[in-house]
Each structure stands twice: as C-alpha cells, then as structure tokens.
C-alpha cells in the first residue's frame, strides 16, 4: 500500500527566500501559480514574447518576464507547457540557463520518460501531478479543499528533491487531499493508458457507438443523446463518490441486472486484449514515437481526426439540448478557457 502524504508531511518554508518560475499560464500553469502565490511563495511567470497570456497573468498580479529570464532567476522551474512544446522551449530557453542546483519540475512525465528532454545531472528533476484539470485544482484550493496529487523524483542532485516536491504539492493544495509517490515511468505510462483506453478514447468511442446504435435503430437523436452521453456524468459521479459497488447501490435493480449481465458482453475479453496491445505500445515507446512524428509533421492526421469527431451527429444534437440548459453554458469550452 502506497504511503499517503498530507499537510503535516510537507513544509512550505522550503521556498523561503527562493523564486519559483511557472513557464506557461494555461490550465495547470495558472492554477499552480495562483495557489502557490496564495500559499506565500514568490512566483514569477515566464512567457514568450507576444503570448496572449501575458496580460492575463499581469492582471492576476504576477511579474511576467521572458522565459529565458524566468529560468535564469528561478530556483525551481515548472515547465507548464504542452508535451509538444516542451523540447523546443527546453533547447532555446531552459537549457542555456539551467545552472547547477536548480530544480526542473513537470506535471506529466512524458518528456523525461521518453527523453525528448534530457536534463544535466547536476539539477533536480521532479514531478508534481494533481489528478485533475487546472480549473478544478484552482477551484478546490479557493474552497479550502484540494485535488489529490502524485509526486516523483527522477534526479536528486541536491538530496532535497522530495522535500521540494512535497512543498510544491502542499502549495497547490495537493496535500489537503493526499499525495502519493510514484515514478516518472509509472505516471507517464498509466496516464497515457487511462487517457487512451478509458477516460478519453474509450469513453468517447463508447458514447458515440451507443448513440449511433440507437439512432440507426430508429430512435430519436435526442433520446440517444440523453441515454448515452448526458446521463453518463450522473453515473460517473456516483462511481467517483462511492466506487462501482456504491454506484450500483444507487441504481434500480433492473439497471443493476443489465450492468452485471450485459456489460461484460460489450466490454469483453477481446476489448481487454486490445487494451493490453495499447499498453504495450505505450511501454515500448511506439505511441510516443508516433505522436512526436505527428506533431513534428504538422498535426495533419491529428487535425483530420479531430475534425471528423466534431462533425459527428452527436455534437449537433448535444449543442441543441445543452442550449436549453443555461447552467451548462459556464462549463462550455470557452467558459473553461476563460478561467485561465
């Protein structure tokens, strides 16, 4: 059983007299920066010239400087950039200013695990990964709560890397909910697997297939949307609060019987076999190589597949039904982006 670290295990005084730099001000970047600032840390923001986030960060009270200067001035540098942007930023702005004794921090292990970034041996390399999107990390913090987080140590040149990771986790609210130590390898591979087979890829494909099945059988798109997408959140919320068994306690006997007798016929051994194949591609680095080649090649297949998804009939039906529920609007894509 993994040890769970809480507030009493972390010490924010680790950051006394130090400067923390957050490179980027997107989903995780804005949340970490604001939470750390309100926890008493000295935080600066590093952004490239012309970034639209400069005005937003300054409005929030931060000193904003060019990325290279932020790295030069900081003791701890959080690379809060997309996986695809990190290598170029590292080569141009981070590496030339990454001197002995500094700490490089990530919220996802992709770049380090797959070696798209290879830091020098005389710096600490750590991971602090809240298990939730940035706007939730921020909201929970402002409400006096927190989002569970993972920490990992890749390089410990100072022999104090774990203290730094725990202090950062406390500063963003993670130790309020509980922090577990892992490795860059485990975080990266399990995160990718979850995204691809269950949380994003698996759930999206399952919802679309269910919607298509009902519509092709002559049922209205509206009914198909409610049954296969809208109600999914209600069930997942129950699972999140009380586990699968707890969710089953809250649904009807008929629903329970359909769950346990039909569910395994849909997600059967063949699905698990393909899940294992997806995991193998992650473990071997095949997925990473394909993704790096895709973004270096201009995102052609990526953009085509996203466009295809946007044109699925469930999107038009969903937009129409959600427009009838005004309380849903603040959860729209634009609403979420405005939070940054």
Please annotate each region the language model reported.
Residues 1-17:
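A short, basic/flexible loop-to-alpha-helix module at the beginning of a structural domain
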Residues 209-212, 216-217, 242-303:
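Interdomain hinge/lid region at the active-site interface
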Residues 68-117:
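Rossmann-fold NAD(P) dinucleotide-binding segment
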Residues 31, 37-60:
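NAD(P)-binding Rossmann-fold cofactor-contacting core
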Residues 105-196:
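Rossmann-fold dinucleotide-binding core
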Residues 159-163, 170-173, 178-217, 222-240:
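Active-site-proximal catalytic alpha-helix in oxidoreductases
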Residues 19-32:
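Glycine-rich adenosine-cofactor-binding loop
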